[in-house]
Amino acid sequence: MARTTDDSKKAAPAAGTADEAQKQKALKMVLTQIKRNFGEGAIMRLGENTRIRVETVPSGAITLDLALGGGLPRGRVIEIYGPESSGKTTLALHAIAEIQKTGGVAAFVDAEHALDPAYAKVLGVNVDDLIISQPDTGEMAMEIVDQLVRSAAIDVIVIDSVAALVPRAEIEGEMGDAHVGLQARLMSQALRKITGNIGKTGCMVIFLNQLRSKIGVMYGNPETTTGGNALKFYASVRLDIRKAETLKKGQDEYGNRVRVKVVKNKVAPPFRKAEFDIIFGKGISSLGCILDLAVEMEIVERKGAWYSYGSERLGQGRENVLALLEENAAQAQEIEIKVREKIASGAAVPAAAVAAPDEGDDDLGDEEV
């Protein structure tokens, strides 16, 4: 009797191996069938291609690229939101300029009818090659975006802005009519339709969004973004951009210091922050970003208000040092090369550029109108 029990124990592993082989055979058959029906790449084991990685595009500010884990991801939905005049459009135009530098094609859906071609040109955008649309309705705007994405000929599309995507029913209706949830429904339907194609074609779609205040909120963050909840879910990256301080020379204002919080990031660690200068009429100060990182990485030494590079004293005050480096392009390039070499060698992102989000960062609700 004891021998029979022992025999059954020995037979059990063999039966388990047979079941496992049968399961693997069935799995192989179904994977082959799915690939035959839907094409190669429709389904795969994650370990089959260890080289799968998200390709990124520079944002125009190297400090923000570090906070994003390399830059703005291609083939993803990105939302940039913030108060008025915080730098949303400037950041989007810099992204367009960076893509055009590599030979990419860009489109700008100007729902606000407020794009300034002269300013875009100053930021480095090739306005002659920029594809622009000024749609009459929200449905028209999203249909144009869908067709551009499906063409697989566009590298980046900027929609400025979600708040200006007015549904057709609202435009054709009377001024006092209530249209509850129309815009949220429009965004939900459109994003369901275009998201799959965005991933297949590698097109980056950037939505610019505005902030609203929720009435009657006693606790928590009263701010909300427009367009419902769909964009929050479909976006791989959400950037909250705010003015941190005004840059002045004497009494004259010449720019803004802005702070960007990576509220959501599906392709790199979230909750990082980046700061950079936006100069009026010139855009993002790339030299300012390099100087800030050089100080953090101890390539440039700062003692009090004085800056030194090696044995050379650069000057007193950040503005004076930036002016000096603008005149001395060779020295500025030398510092930039050292900064980029440190980043490429895997140097940690400076602690000043990484921080936990402020309370309420990810509590932005969404209005349904």
UniProtKB/Swiss-Prot annotation:
SMART domains: AAA
A GO CC term attached to the entry: cytoplasm
Region ranges (Disordered): 1-20, 350-369
Entries under PROSITE patterns matching the protein: RECA_1 (PS00321), RECA_2 (PS50162), RECA_3 (PS50163)
The keyword DNA repair is annotated on this UniProt entry: yes
GO molecular function terms attached to this record: ATP binding; ATP hydrolysis activity; ATP-dependent DNA damage sensor activity; damaged DNA binding; single-stranded DNA binding
Compositionally biased tracts (Acidic residues): 358-369
Primary localization class, coarse: cytoplasm
Basic and acidic residues bias: start-end ranges: 1-10
InterPro entries recorded: AAA+_ATPase, DNA_recomb/repair_RecA, DNA_recomb/repair_RecA_CS, P-loop_NTPase, RecA-like_C, RecA-like_N, RecA_ATP-bd, RecA_C_sf
Cellular location(s): Cytoplasm
Top-rank taxon, per record: Bacteria
GO annotation (BP), single: DNA recombination
Alphabetized Gene3D superfamilies for the sequence: P-loop containing nucleotide triphosphate hydrolases
Xref: CDD domains: RecA
Keyword Flavoprotein recorded: no
One Pfam family this sequence matches: RecA_C
Residues engaged in binding ATP: 82-89
Alphabetized UniProt keyword annotations: ATP-binding, Cytoplasm, DNA damage, DNA recombination, DNA repair, DNA-binding, Nucleotide-binding, SOS response
HAMAP family to which the protein is assigned, alphabetical: RecA
Free-text function comment from the UniProt entry: Can catalyze the hydrolysis of ATP in the presence of single-stranded DNA, the ATP-dependent uptake of single-stranded DNA by duplex DNA, and the ATP-dependent hybridization of homologous single-stranded DNAs. It interacts with LexA causing its activation and leading to its autocatalytic cleavage.
Family: Belongs to the RecA family.
Name this protein carries in UniProt: Protein RecA
Organism: Gloeobacter violaceus (strain ATCC 29082 / PCC 7421)
Name of the gene: recA
